[in-house]
C-alpha cells in the first residue's frame, strides 16, 4: 500500500561508459524520501571506478551514512572499484562510532569474491574487521529475492556475452510499479519477463545507432540508442532511462539521443546528465 507522502527518488550519479572523462561512470541511487536522511534510506547501484563516487554523492546531497545497501552488477573496474571506497567510508564510520546499523553488499559470486579480496587487501585491519560482523557480503543467485528499502527485489542473471558474469534487478517500489536495471549490456530475451511492463527501466546505450560505425559497440557487448528504445517499446516500458554512454559531445548528447530514440519508442524517454534526478 502506498504510504502518505511517499516518494521514491532516482538519482543518476554517473552516466558514462568505462573510459568516460567528461562525466562519471554509470551508477545511480534510489532513495525513499519519506525516510528523509534516516539511516537506510539509500540504495546504491554500482559505484563507478574510484573515489569520484564520494564527490558525486556529495554533489547530489546524498549522505553516505544513509547508504545501507549496495548492489554491484559485475566486476569490471568502472562498476566495482568505487564500491571499495564505499566500504572504506562505511567501515571507517563504524570504527569511529558514527555509522549506525549494518551495511549489506549485494552481487554475484564473482563480485562478492572480488570485493572481499580487495577490502582485505586495501582497508586497514581495523576497518576490514567489520566484514562479517556489521558489513555483510551477499552472493545473489538468478531469480533470488530480498528486501531493500523495505521493497521486494528480484535479481537476475543477464546472460552476459562479455568477460564477466553480470546481474540486473527488478524492484517493486510501490504496488504494481517496478523499476528494473539490466546492467551495462543490452537486455536479452531470456530476461524480458523481469522487465515487461516495467514502470521504469535503466538501460545502457553506448551510442546512437547513427554512429554505430564510429563506436562499434557490439564487439564490446554494448548497444545503441535505437536498439534500447526498440526493446523498451516491445516490452511496453513506461519510462526508459539511458546511461553508460560515450561522452564525446555531452552538450548535445541529450537532444541527439532523444531524437533517435523517439523515432522508435513511444514512452517517456530520458537521457540524463550526471546528478539528474527523477521522482518515481
Regions inferred by a protein language model and the residue ranges of each:
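Metallo-beta-lactamase
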Residues: 99-165, 274
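Divalent metal-coordination and catalytic microenvironments
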Residues: 10, 46, 57, 74, ...
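Short gly/ser/thr-rich secondary-structure transition/capping motifs
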Residues: 52-54, 134-138, 180-186, 222
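Active-site neighborhood of phospho(di)ester-bond hydrolases with catalytic His/Asp-centered motifs
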Residues: 44-48, 67-75, 108, 179-183, ...
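Active-site metal-binding motif and surrounding structural segment of the metallo-beta-lactamase
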Residues: 51-103
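Active-site-proximal loop/helix segment associated with metal-binding centers of metalloenzymes
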Residues: 20-23, 139-194, 198-210
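Cap/insert and terminal regions of metallo-dependent hydrolase folds
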Residues: 186-275
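Conserved beta-strand hairpin/beta-sheet module of binuclear metal-dependent hydrolase folds
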Residues: 4-60, 165-183
Amino acid at each position: 500500500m502506498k504510504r502518505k507522502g511517499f516518494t521514491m527518488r532516482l538519482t543518476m550519479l554517473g552516466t558514462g561508459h568505462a573510459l568516460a572523462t567528461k562525466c562519471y561512470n554509470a551508477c545511480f541511487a534510489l532513495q525513499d524520501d519519506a525516510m528523509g536522511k534516516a539511516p537506510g534510506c539509500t540504495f546504491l547501484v554500482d559505484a563507478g571506478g574510484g573515489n569520484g563516487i564520494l564527490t558525486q554523492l556529495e554533489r547530489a546531497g546524498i549522505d553516505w551514512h544513509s547508504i545501507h545497501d549496495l548492489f554491484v552488477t559485475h566486476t569490471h573496474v568502472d562498476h566495482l572499484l568505487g564500491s571499495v571506497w564505499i566500504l572504506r567510508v562505511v567501515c571507517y564510520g563504524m570504527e569511529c562510532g558514527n555509522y549506525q546499523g549494518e551495511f549489506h553488499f549485494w552481487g554475484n559470486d564473482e563480485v562478492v569474491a572480488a570485493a572481499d579480496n580487495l577490502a582485505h587487501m586495501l582497508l586497514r585491519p581495523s576497518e576490514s574487521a567489520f566484514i562479517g560482523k556489521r558489513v555483510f557480503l551477499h552472493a545473489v543467485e538468478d531469480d533470488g529475492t530480498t528486501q531493500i528499502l523495505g521493497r521486494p527485489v528480484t535479481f537476475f542473471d543477464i546472460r552476459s556475452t562479455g568477460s564477466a558474469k553480470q546481474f540486473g534487478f527488478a524492484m517493486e517500489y510501490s504496488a504494481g510499479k517496478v523499476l528494473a536495471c539490466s546492467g551495462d549490456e543490452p537486455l536479452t530475451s531470456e530476461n524480458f519477463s523481469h522487465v515487461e511492463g516495467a514502470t521504469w527501466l535503466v538501460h545502457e546505450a553506448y551510442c546512437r545507432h547513427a554512429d554505430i560505425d564510429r563506436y562499434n559497440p557490439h564487439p564490446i557487448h554494448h548497444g545503441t540508442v535505437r536498439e534500447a528504445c526498440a526493446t523498451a517499446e516491445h516490452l511496453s516500458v513506461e519510462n526508459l532511462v539511458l546511461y553508460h554512454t560515450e561522452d564525446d559531445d555531452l552538450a548535445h548528447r541529450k537532444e541527439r539521443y532523444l531524437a533517435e530514440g523517439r523515432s522508435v519508442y513511444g514512452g517517456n524517454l530520458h537521457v540524463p546528465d550526471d546528478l539528474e534526478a527523477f521522482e518515481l
